[in-house]
Amino acid sequence: DQGAGVTYLEPTGSQIGHKESIKDTARVLGRMYDGIEYRGFGQEIVEELAQYAGVPVFNGLTNEFHPTQMLADALTMREHSSKPLNEIAFAYVGDARFNMGNSLLLLGAKMGMDVRIGAPKALWPSENIIAQARALAEETGAKVTLTENAEEAVQGVDFIHTDVWVSMGEPKETWEERIALLKSFRVTPELMAASGNPNVKFMHCLPAFHNRETKVGEWIYETFGLNGVEVT
């Protein structure tokens, strides 16, 4: 849109970390481009790219973090609320161990917001991530809450976030275990109403399993009787 020259290197078209080291790939691409965005799995890969590229490297998504999504989500919350960011309360409900749960917790803490995680304790962010969030909150005045009760998490919030319950690369068998753990953390009209805020808004980084109109959605309905998974 802005007239930049863009090259897309798909996984099968790059030898990064396979026949060519990440360090060498970073040095070559850094001589050819003004910036690099990496979207993949390991956080250590994007950090090594940033160490050796010599140009800005953007994290488009890793297993651990999704910072570019946070830029979009912070802007969206600001645009759709009359409050400044440090007065906004939001909750993330669902599996909070991966990039969206980690990143939203740290975003809220860094921006001085009232951020809540609602999930079974087994699916909370790691102790290291929680400690980082609490340390940031001490500096910014943020309020950080983690609870195993979905209704408690959403009480009084302005926004409710969620994400898929089974991530890319996880086996199909994971669904049964994850649904058993998270069924009470689905975002439903009842959970939205539990916020007590008639203007509460729902956010999802997408794609969402919210109905039967996909192959996975239909399989989940036939197997588990759910029309929609993390949201319905």
Curated annotation (Swiss-Prot):
Coiled-coil spans in chain: none
UniProtKB keywords: Amino-acid biosynthesis, Arginine biosynthesis, Cytoplasm, Transferase
GO cellular component, one term: cytoplasm
Residues flagged as site, Important for structural integrity: E79
Pathway participation: Amino-acid biosynthesis; L-arginine biosynthesis; L-arginine from L-ornithine and carbamoyl phosphate: step 1/3
Enzyme class label: transferase
InterPro entries: Asp/Orn_carbamoyltranf_P-bd (IPR006132), Asp/Orn_carbamoylTrfase (IPR006130), Asp/Orn_carbamoylTrfase_sf (IPR036901), Asp_carbamoyltransf_Asp/Orn-bd (IPR006131), Orn/put_carbamltrans (IPR002292)
Subcellular location: Cytoplasm
GO MF terms held by the record: amino acid binding; ornithine carbamoyltransferase activity
Entry EC no(s): 2.1.3.3
Catalytic activity annotation: carbamoyl phosphate + L-ornithine = L-citrulline + phosphate + H(+)
Family according to the record: Belongs to the aspartate/ornithine carbamoyltransferase superfamily. OTCase family.
Name listed for the protein in its UniProt record: Ornithine carbamoyltransferase
